[in-house]
A protein has these predicted regions:
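Metal-dependent nucleotidyl/phosphoryl-transfer cores and adjacent nucleic-acid-binding surfaces
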Residues: 1-311
Length: 311
């Protein structure tokens, strides 16, 4: 993988594509182990909008977009220009459903309400109503939420950068002004747009280097907690990744029958035997998609023997 050098300024759409064409053969790709390949490079997208009321209903107009791949950043003023550019990007990188470019957006739920009608989507994952954490187009562009990953504002995320510094410009755009795609923008205003995407690119590049590759970056910051718990509870990766072996391991580790294990995957419960000699403990396990706390019957001697399991 070539050395990452942060972007220094905007380039035109034509220069952006020219640099992308010359750089594309050098871009590394990685697999997530599920027959899906990702470009192991940072990419970011951001828009600026003006909100106002029209016939009593609140609406918004996108008047500027910024798009960056690796260390190349460009901008435009209309959706048509962005769609034309993105179509060219997918052609250059030859992306499709199993060969994707991950594009991070800081606060994807907001941007998605603006872009959802401009593309065809094959898969969208929502954490809540109208709150997607990722969305995949039919051309293999996967938009992800960097806000869910960092858990912080863009300004706070910029302050946390350690290797690739990129401070968010002081202040912000004057959102009280109503702008549209033909409204002239000053160099200072364009500077805000540039630095916002530069922060995203530098942040994702640091995550790529810290996590090993882009396929290992979780969707949200809580994914790191789940990964830590999995590694702590099941340090043997071969046992964990082999489904049948893992099932036997789980049955032996928590002392349940095969029938009880099958039921627990759906009911998350177990009958409590009426015995004074039994007390109930809980421990973290991985059932279906989420970490759960399973309560099972154990003798006091068994519990004291397993106390070190949590330390």
């Amino acid at each position: 993988m070539s050395q990452y050098v942060p972007a220094e300024g905007f380039v035109s759409n034509a220069e952006f594509l020219g640099k992308l064409i010359s750089s594309a053969p050098k871009f590394e790709t990685v697999s997530n182990g599920k027959k899906e390949i990702f470009y192991n490079i940072p990419a970011g997208f951001d828009i600026e909008t003006s909100s106002f009321y029209y016939h009593g209903e609140k609406t918004a107009i996108m008047y500027e977009w910024t798009f960056g791949i690796n260390n190349i950043i460009t901008y435009g003023r209309t959706w048509e220009h962005f769609k034309t550019l993105l179509a060219a990007v997918t052609a250059v990188l030859q992306t499709h459903q199993n060969r994707r470019l991950v594009v991070y957006v800081h606060n994807l739920p907001y941007e998605f309400q603006c872009i959802r009608k401009h593309f065809s989507w094959t898969k969208i994952f929502f954490l809540d109503n109208r709150k997607p954490v990722y969305a995949i187009t039919d051309k293999g562009i996967e938009f992800r939420c960097s806000l869910k990953l960092s858990g912080k504002s863009l300004a706070a995320t910029a302050k946390d950068l350690t290797k690739y510094k990129a401070e968010k410009m002081a202040g912000d755009l004057d959102y009280s002004l109503i702008r549209h795609p033909e409204t002239p923008l000053t160099e200072k205003e364009l500077g805000y747009c540039f630095h916002d995407v530069k922060v995203i690119l530098n942040y994702i590049q640091e995550k790529i280097e810290q996590d090993g590759n882009i396929a290992r970056i979780p969707l949200t910051n809580t994914g790191y907690v789940r990964r830590y718990c999995k590694n702590a509870c099941f340090p043997d990766e071969e046992v964990y990744t082999n489904a049948s072996t893992y099932a036997e391991y789980e049955i032996d580790a928590i002392g349940v029958s095969r029938d009880e294990r099958v039921l627990s995957r759906w009911l998350h419960a177990r009958e409590c035997p009426p015995s004074r000699e039994i007390m109930y403990e809980g421990w973290l396990i991985r059932l279906y998609k989420f970490l759960s706390i399973r309560f099972g019957s154990k003798k006091v001697s068994d519990i004291t023997r397993k106390v070190s399991w949590f330390s």
